């Protein structure tokens, strides 16, 4: 019976003995380990900006379908990022004030770029005579940026031009 009590002690003792074939990970630059902080970021605002830039290039060349694909990719990624930042902001409230501040800053930046993508998509849909598809994008811009922001005011003005709303906003 006493022998059974010694077994955990033996495991602890022999478990801490270094092994001959032990391999240690070596990282010369700690920043290389942070995959999403590198230049080639898939899940980042810079990637959203890349999609927008590519869409703009296709608009200049008159290829609206390709531009739409890039703008929709930018919009999808921006919405994902905004959702992730919002979730992290909520999760850390009351625990560590630094993290919600960072997430709020990044979230605002993401919503700003989402409004930019929505504006470009709405313009493209209006130009290709599909204003019914532009309306939800303009309404979303007003919702995420507020009617008092320059983006919100511009989106509401576009809704007036489309005939979706009639009352002028004096804000």
Predicted regions and their residues:
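Structural signature of alpha-solenoid helical repeat junctions
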Residues: 46, 106-113, 151
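Alpha-helical linker/edge segments of TPR/alpha-solenoid repeat scaffolds
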Residues: 27-28, 92-109, 160-171
